[in-house]
């Protein structure tokens, strides 16, 4: 097989790898709560971005639901979320990645230090 064909085959295989996100970044809510506000800021800053739950048709992210993120690039962020009971939590130094089915998730364990 020629080197050119091998290169094309390699690119095709890379694009077909299961589990690699080919589209927009997504958040996965692994908490047991409905999240009504989700904001990201570069680590260590208070520069909170837009409320990402506005991207959901009902304006909230239910437990085990995924949410398309808007205007977010891969990197490290502090994540501030509010659930439907009014609990506000900040999860620090979260890695947002582009090469998975979801960019990041938050679980109930991540919220263990939040006030209830």
Locations of the language-model features?
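Bacterial N-terminal signal peptides that target proteins for export
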Residues: 1-8
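Bacterial N-terminal signal peptides
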Residues: 8-16
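Sec/Tat signal peptide C-region and signal peptidase I cleavage site
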Residues: 17-22
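Structural beta-strand segments of beta-rich domains
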Residues: 23-25, 65
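Asparagine-centered strand-capping/turn motif at beta-strand->loop junctions
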Residues: 27-33
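Intrinsically disordered, low-complexity Pro/Gly/Ser/Thr-rich segments with frequent PxxP/GP/PP motifs
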Residues: 48-73
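A short tyrosine-centered beta-strand micro-motif
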Residues: 77-79
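Structured interaction patches on ligand/partner-binding surfaces of diverse proteins
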Residues: 82-112
């Amino acid at each position: 097989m020629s080197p050119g064909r091998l290169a094309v085959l390699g690119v095709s295989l890379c694009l077909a790898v299961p589990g690699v996100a080919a589209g927009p970044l997504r958040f996965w809510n692994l908490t047991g709560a409905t999240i009504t506000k989700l904001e990201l800021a570069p680590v260590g800053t208070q520069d909170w971005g837009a409320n990402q739950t506005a991207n959901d048709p009902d304006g909230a992210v239910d437990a085990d639901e995924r949410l398309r993120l808007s205007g977010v690039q891969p990197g490290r962020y502090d994540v501030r979320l509010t659930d439907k009971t009014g609990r506000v939590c900040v999860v620090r130094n979260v890695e947002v990645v582009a090469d998975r089915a979801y960019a990041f998730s938050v679980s109930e364990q991540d919220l263990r230090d939040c006030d209830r």
